[in-house]
């Protein structure tokens, strides 16, 4: 097995929340750099879990286009500010957060009342300004998930007066990678993979690359011991199931049904022993009855009888 090393060549904090890390993975065989880089990038961006507010209830507010007396921001601006709040959650279950502030005051994420399983990455994150002695009261639902969810696709089971919020669960904002050729010795050329990761502060770039690699490892491990079943084997099982169906399932007319029964045709398996030509040889079984059976087989089971007798 080829051995390679991974090294963090740069790490820094960007602003109040963002974290950045740059990593080098080498030496890789030619072609493996782009394979590994692309797989890691997609996994890190789409498969890592993050935490976000998904629904909000504000006292006295019925819809997102409302205004709140004594509060500088309208409801839509408050929802947009809440969308920017970054959480770190140690629990997969949905949580409820609350805040109750009497003004005048500046409302920030650090004033949220949260369970011990959740923490705010940036307590200084601005939410709203209360201009007078108005009481600002809000309740919100927090979930852990992957990717991005639009408000109209969310389903809130708590109450009809919760406002849905577009939720960004992705803990990683951006991933870049590039592949460089590295000469080792006089004849050997290897790939060097450089990965840059920007996170929202809820996880570190090191955690992001580790979790992304774990997702890929679990994905590929499941392919190691697959029990491949041939399509022919699958079809034979399906055919066996269909053949055991009784002719009553075809819902034929009384005349056609009685003719088949008198000919000792009780199941689809019995019927499949006949061609269209042979059906007409059954006593009192005319062209109309034959067409009825052929149509029912095709419509209900997707089966076509051969037109002529097999040699």
Curated annotation (Swiss-Prot):
Keywords: Chloroplast, DNA-directed RNA polymerase, Nucleotidyltransferase, Plastid, Transcription, Transferase. The keyword Ribosomal protein does not apply. It catalyses: RNA(n) + a ribonucleoside 5'-triphosphate = RNA(n+1) + diphosphate. It is found in: Plastid, Chloroplast. InterPro entries: DNA-dir_RNA_pol_insert (IPR011262), DNA-dir_RNA_pol_RpoA/D/Rpb3 (IPR011263), DNA-dir_RpoA (IPR011773), RBP11-like (IPR036603), RNAP_asu_C (IPR011260), RNApol_insert_sf (IPR036643). The N-terminal domain is essential for RNAP assembly and basal transcription, whereas the C-terminal domain is involved in interaction with transcriptional regulators and with upstream promoter elements. NCBIfam families: PRK05182.2-2, PRK05182.2-5, rpoA. In plastids the minimal PEP RNA polymerase catalytic core is composed of four subunits: alpha, beta, beta', and beta''. When a (nuclear-encoded) sigma factor is associated with the core the holoenzyme is formed, which can initiate transcription. This is DNA-directed RNA polymerase subunit alpha. It comes from Pyropia yezoensis (Susabi-nori). The gene is rpoA.
């Amino acid at each position: 097995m080829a051995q390679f090393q991974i090294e963090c060549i740069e790490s820094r904090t960007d602003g109040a929340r963002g974290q950045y890390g740059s990593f080098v993975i080498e030496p890789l065989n030619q072609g493996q750099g782009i394979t590994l880089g692309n797989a890691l990038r997609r996994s890190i961006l789409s498969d890592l879990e993050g935490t976000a507010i998904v629904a909000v209830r504000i006292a006295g507010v019925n819809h997102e286009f409302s205004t709140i007396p004594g509060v500088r921001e309208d409801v839509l601006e408050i929802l947009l500010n809440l969308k920017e709040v970054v959480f770190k959650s140690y629990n997969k279950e949905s949580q409820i957060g609350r805040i109750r502030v009497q003004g005048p005051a500046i409302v920030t994420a650090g004033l949220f009342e949260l369970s011990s399983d959740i923490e705010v990455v940036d307590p200084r994150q601005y939410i709203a300004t209360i201009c007078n002695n108005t009481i600002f009261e809000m309740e919100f639902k927090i979930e852990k998930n992957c990717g991005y969810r639009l408000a109209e696709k969310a389903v809130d089971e708590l109450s009809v007066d919760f406002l849905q919020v577009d939720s960004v669960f992705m803990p990683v904002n951006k991933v870049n990678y590039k592949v460089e050729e590295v000469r080792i010795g006089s004849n050997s050329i290897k790939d060097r993979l450089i990965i840059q990761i920007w996170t929202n502060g809820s996880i570190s770039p090191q955690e992001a690359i580790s979790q992304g690699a774990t997702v890929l490892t679990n994905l590929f491990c499941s392919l190691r011991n697959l029990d491949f079943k041939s399509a022919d084997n699958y079809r034979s099982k399906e055919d066996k199931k269909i053949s055991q169906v009784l002719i009553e399932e075809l819902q034929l007319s009384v005349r056609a049904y009685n003719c088949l029964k008198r000919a000792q045709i009780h199941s689809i398996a019995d019927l499949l022993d006949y061609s269209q030509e042979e059906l007409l040889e059954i006593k009192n079984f005319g062209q109309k009855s034959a067409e009825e059976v052929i149509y029912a087989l095709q419509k209900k089971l997707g089966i076509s009888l051969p037109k002529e007798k097999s040699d």
